[in-house]
Amino acid sequence: MESDCQFLVAPPQPHMYYDTAAAAVDEAQFLRQMVAAADHHAAAAGRGGGDGDGGGGGGGGGGERKRRFTEEQVRSLETTFHARRAKLEPREKAELARELGLQPRQVAIWFQNKRARWRSKQIEHDYAALRAQYDALHARVESLRQEKLALAAQVDELRGKLNERQDQSGSCDGGGAEGDDDDKRNSVMNASSSGLVEEDYVSCLAVPVVDVSEDGSAACGGSSYEYDHHLDYLGGGQLPDPFCGMPDLWETWPMVEWNAVA
């Protein structure tokens, strides 16, 4: 049973992210080798076609079979490739070709094509893994950004409440201080008023003592007045206290007038 693997396989298309200087150099070298192999194969096919024309049509069929690998050959090449990822030495290629009944150049070209396809698939796999990690990190960053905005909003709200509470506390303290000042001021005014009233009351009650001597003269408030017996009706010969406390009345109403009336 023949395999679909061709002897000459076209190089894989470069991936959109597999665009490096090393890859470009490998691809150019690969193309040069493929062109040389195609020229060599065309020359061999021309020689085989001439032989077929002279000896029959079997030569063309033999050339077509040379361009394909059998399933057993492909399986052996795949096993060797997965076991030996590194490039094979020329001696190893010759031994493998002799075991599989192939030419060393056929084995070298197959390994070269297989390695290019494997690199492309590996790069795609790595890119997919990195892309998944990037998407996860991007989602995490967005989540952290939203969380940061939410925390900033909470901080602003708490700061506003704290400032409002401090303002209210300051206004209450100011009002209390003003109230204390008013209370102190009222206390001082009340004390002053009480002092004035008590002073007036004490001055009114501070009545000088009237002494009546044997000669009939009376001393009241530090002044001497002649005692008149006609004043007995006022209270046993003693003047009321208010009159003693107000000497102006005595100046306005002298004792002479009282005697004249009597």
UniProtKB/Swiss-Prot annotation:
This is Homeobox-leucine zipper protein HOX24. Residues 121-165 are annotated as: Leucine-zipper. Residues 46-62 have a biased composition (Gly residues). One of its GO terms (biological process) is positive regulation of DNA-templated transcription. Residues 61-122 bind DNA. The keyword DNA-binding applies. Its main location: nucleus. Belongs to the HD-ZIP homeobox family. Class I subfamily. It comes from Oryza sativa subsp. indica. The keyword Transcription applies. CDD domains: homeodomain. It is found in: Nucleus.
